[in-house]
Curated annotation (Swiss-Prot):
Name of the protein: NADH-quinone oxidoreductase subunit D
HAMAP family linked to this entry: NDH1_NuoD (MF_01358)
E.C. designation(s): 7.1.1.-
Keyword Cell membrane among record annotations: yes
Lineage of origin: Bacteria, Pseudomonadati, Pseudomonadota, Betaproteobacteria, Nitrosomonadales
Subunit structure: NDH-1 is composed of 14 different subunits. Subunits NuoB, C, D, E, F, and G constitute the peripheral sector of the complex.
Length: 417
């Protein structure tokens, strides 16, 4: 009699639900998954090696391109590692700006996660709504850095420049009528802080809108409740962090447990799940929208009342002001030296971690006293989550695999590095 064997199937890398270039080799018994073997490396760009041949400052833009959905948070961990080795004091205003943009980035990340996760499961409306809000947040990125995504805004010792006093305005064109432009520029009459404040006032209603569409939706619950269950013990053993760990009921958040920058001065809560399934992880991230909004509001209030420097006064690390360079030759030479040769970091090693939207994002930096890192190791949260995919999907149907990949919020820029 012929032997009955499991069916082997390729999932991805050209699959709309693969979230990038994920290739899974699935072993199936009928439509039930027996084993899921992730094959990674299709987006490997050698970031860790590239950083060894670039000055410390030149590697900042590489960080944006790791998890290309949470740009500024990646930069944050990198500059914090450099600051640890240098023993640099970051001005308080710069710390508040960093925290504010970290939370803006968290909302940006979760909006894309929500839209893509819902679209994978079959709910299209949320995807369109999420991109409407992302547009406003990209405008905030653009106002401070000139780039809508890869900002390269953080610097060792602070940030590139202070927040602008006025927002860029839309102009009339062949595709935008006078009425359209007037409507678009309505909330752009003030400063960037006014624009962000206007967004934070509108955003809670948008979150309620997403919840109306999904939270009590019968089909959404059927597709997510009891799917991809991870117990608290297994979540910790598998190295999960962020919403994946908190969804299983473990209240671990670096912003509370190991506060960095000014998080210990701010008032916010850490949402946790109960059952550790896709639905609980969805609820955790939805509540994170509201908590991030709370943090941004507190940062706006503080930044309005406290002007000041936004980068360290250590001239070995920070460039001279642009106004000075226009009439002082010494300042121009100083600027040129800083951006060609770079600054030297004392020999030693440091690990800096931030609460990234996906989990704990860490940078382990080793310096040999040169102007380039001797070794840069990136701890990507998605890497540990993808490693747990096999365990999470066993016994589930192929259709549930799509929901589990969505709940993990995988981005291959950071996994393949």
């Amino acid at each position: 009699m012929a032997e009955i064997r499991n069916y082997t199937m390729n999932f991805g890398p050209q699959h709309p639900a693969a979230h990038g270039v994920l290739r899974l080799v699935l072993e199936l018994d009928g439509e039930v998954i027996q084993r899921a073997d992730p094959h990674i490396g299709l987006l490997h760009r050698g970031t860790e090696k590239l950083a060894e041949n670039r000055t410390y400052l030149q590697s900042v833009p590489y960080m944006d391109r790791l998890d290309y959905v949470s740009m500024m948070v990646n930069e944050h961990a990198y500059v914090m590692a450099i600051e640890k080795l240098l023993g640099l004091e970051v001005p308080l205003r710069a710390q508040y700006i960093r925290v504010m943009f970290d939370e803006i980035t968290r909302i940006l990340n979760h909006l894309l996660w929500l839209g893509a996760h819902a679209l994978d499961v079959g709910a299209m409306t949320v995807f369109l709504y999420a991109f409407r809000e992302r547009e406003d947040l990209f405008d905030c990125y653009e106002a401070v850095s000139g780039a809508r995504m890869h900002a390269a805004y953080y610097r060792p010792g602070g940030v590139y420049r202070d927040l602008p006093d006025r927002m860029p305005q839309y102009e009339e064109s062949t595709v935008r009528s006078k009425e359209d432009v007037k409507q678009l520029n309505e909330n752009r009459q003030g400063s960037l802080l006014d624009f962000i404040e206007d967004f934070t006032n509108r955003f809670p209603a948008y979150v309620d809108e997403y919840e109306t569409l999904l939270t009590d939706n019968r089909i959404w619950k059927q597709r997510t409740v009891g799917i991809g269950v991870v117990s608290p013990e297994r979540a910790m053993a598998l190295g999960m962090t962020g919403p994946m760990l908190r969804g299983s009921g473990v209240a671990w958040d670096l912003r509370k447990k190991q506060p960095y920058e000014v998080y210990d001065r701010l008032d916010f809560d850490i949402p946790i799940g109960v059952n550790g399934d896709c639905y609980d992880r969805y609820l955790v991230r939805i509540e994170e929208f509201r908590q991030s909004n709370r943090i941004i509001k507190q940062c706006i209030d503080w930044l309005r009342k406290n002007p000041g420097p936004v980068i360290s006064d250590n001239t070995k690390v920070a460039p001279p002001p642009r106004e000075e360079m226009k009439h002082d030759m010494e300042a121009l030479i100083h600027h040129f030296k800083l951006f060609t040769e770079g600054f030297h970091v004392p020999a030693g090693e440091a690990y800096a971690a931030v609460e990234h939207p996906k989990g704990e994002f860490g940078i382990y930096l080793i310096s040999d006293g040169a102007n380039k890192p001797y070794r840069l190791k990136i701890r990507a949260p998605g890497f540990a989550h993808l490693a747990a995919l096999d365990e999470m999907t066993r016994g589930h149907m192929i259709a549930d695999l799509v929901a589990i990949i969505g709940t993990q919020d995988i981005v291959f820029g950071e996994i393949d590095r």
